[in-house]
Regions:
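Pre-Walker A (Motif I) flank of P-loop NTPase domains
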Residues: 1-5, 71-72
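P-loop (Walker A) phosphate-binding loop of NTP-binding proteins
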Residues: 9
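Structural motif
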Residues: 5, 75-77, 99
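Walker A/P-loop
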Residues: 15
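ATP-dependent small-molecule kinase phosphotransfer cores
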Residues: 28-91, 117, 123-124
Length: 127
């Protein structure tokens, strides 16, 4: 068996679906964004703001390649920008890859809700 890799745009449901599928299959779940934050000590948003989108995508790709090298088969939610990296494209060949789609309206609503939660988490009156 090989890893099951979920790809799609931000807000397409990779993390939510990934957790559910991993639980159903009895496999570990690896989330590219969470692994990046654990490795770097900061969020993807902060990396992009400080170093730019290319640096972010390079770091996301490095984290994803490490996850793909894990010997235990897992369900992996890939960061949207990471799957465009040439080394990641090559590494995904022959693996089980599922593209999650959502309508633009659904994506916008999910990203807006995520942005609200991120803002609320950092707002002094909410703490």
């Amino acid at each position: 068996m090989s890893h099951l890799v979920l790809i799609g745009l931000m807000g397409s449901g990779k993390t939510t679906v990934g957790r559910r599928v991993a639980a159903a299959l009895g496999r570990p779940f690896l989330d590219n964004d969470a692994l990046l934050q654990r490795r770097s000590g900061t969020s993807a948003r902060d990396i992009e703001a400080g170093a730019g989108p290319n640096a972010l995508h390079d770091q996301e790709a490095a984290v994803l390649l490490d996850a793909l090298a894990t010997p235990q088969t897992a369900v992996i939610a890939a960061a949207a920008g990471a799957v465009l990296h040439p080394r990641v494209v090559a590494a995904l060949r022959g693996l089980d890859v599922v593209y999650l789609r959502a309508t633009p309206a659904v994506l916008a609503a999910r990203l807006e809700a995520e942005q609200r939660m991120a803002t609320d988490d950092h707002h002094p009156s909410v703490r």
